[in-house]
Swiss-Prot record:
Purpose of the protein: One of the primary rRNA binding proteins, it binds directly near the 3'-end of the 23S rRNA, where it nucleates assembly of the 50S subunit.
Free-text description of this protein's post-translational modifications in UniProt: Methylated by PrmB.
Cellular component GO terms held in the UniProt record: cytosolic large ribosomal subunit
Disordered: annotated segments: 139-164, 218-243
SUPFAM superfamilies xref list: Translation proteins
Subunit structure, as described in the record: Part of the 50S ribosomal subunit. Forms a cluster with proteins L14 and L19.
Gene3D superfamilies, per the entry: 3.30.160.810, Translation factors
Protein name as catalogued: Large ribosomal subunit protein uL3
Lineage: Bacteria, Pseudomonadati, Pseudomonadota, Alphaproteobacteria, Hyphomicrobiales
Biased composition (Low complexity): 230-243
Cross-referenced InterPro entries: Ribosomal_uL3, Ribosomal_uL3_bac/org-type, Ribosomal_uL3_CS, Transl_B-barrel_sf
Organism: Afipia carboxidovorans (strain ATCC 49405 / DSM 1227 / KCTC 32145 / OM5)
Protein's UniProt keywords contain Translocase: no
NCBIfam families: L3_bact (TIGR03625)
Family note: Belongs to the universal ribosomal protein uL3 family.
């Protein structure tokens, strides 16, 4: 199981195929996504990589966080996230994961925070039909109607769909196809919409419900902290090579 990446949502556009078909895509930017720490089974009980992305001034950080980045010899990051990985998918601390970590055509799961909509009624929040436009209904056309029974059960059950705060939820969109990658600019183009607003932080992982392409790099495509070469593409293509 490979690591995912932290990206920032740039916006949406469309790309054209050779056949003239247009594909709506979301542009995600990998802003210096580096490995800042390891989680091992012996010490932590599980195996994971801690990644960081984006620049942040150390003066605005707690001393404890500054110390963690100092130990890792990595510049302070604005966004930090953990990704569970298998023991054979460990990437060295300080390595920068590239956009070609994902290959064109593979499917990914994208997680982000949805756009906040404030206080919303039942029709907007839950797609309720509302009441009738006429025939005795006045003022309450967009109300939700009854919320429960009579004397039995004599209450409104928990988790009943009602008006309330809408948005700012953690949303995962499954099986989005990778359309293009741009290593030089650190861009990843995925088909369809991605949850969140422009500039929001997004995590991208290999799709859980789709097979990983053979061309995908293992443990990943990355650039070492000392400026070394990136890891080679696939295990069978990297025999005898060092990362």
């Amino acid at each position: 199981m490979r690591s995912g990446v932290i990206a920032q949502k740039v916006g949406m556009m469309r790309v054209f195929t050779e056949a003239g078909e247009h594909i709506p895509v979301t542009v995600l930017k990998l802003g210096n996504c580096q490995v800042v720490g390891h989680r091992t089974k012996d010490k932590n009980g599980y195996t994971a990589l801690q990644l960081g992305a984006g620049a942040r001034k150390s003066v605005y950080m707690p001393k404890a966080e500054r110390g963690q980045f100092a130990v890792a010899k990595v510049e302070p990051k604005r966004k930090v996230a953990e990704f569970r990985v298998s023991e054979d998918a460990i990437i060295p601390v300080g390595a920068e994961i590239q956009a070609d970590h994902f290959v064109v055509g593979q499917f990914v799961d994208v997680t982000g925070t949805s756009i906040g909509k404030g206080y919303a009624g039942g029709m907007k929040r839950w797609n309720f039909g509302g009441l009738r436009a006429t025939h005795g209904v006045s003022v309450s056309h967009r109300s939700i109607g009854s919320t429960g029974g009579r004397q039995d059960p004599g209450k409104t059950f928990k988790n009943k769909k009602m008006p309330g705060h809408m948005g700012v939820d953690r949303i995962t969109t499954l099986n989005l196809r990778v359309v293009q990658t741009d290593v030089e600019r650190g861009l990843l183009l995925v088909e369809g919409a991605v949850p969140g607003s422009k500039g929001g932080w997004i995590t991208v992982r290999d799709a859980v419900k789709k097979p990983l392409p053979k061309e995908a790099a293992k443990p990943g495509k990355f650039k070492l902290a000392d400026g070394g070469d990136k890891a080679a593409a696939a295990p069978e293509a990297t025999a005898g090579e060092g990362a």
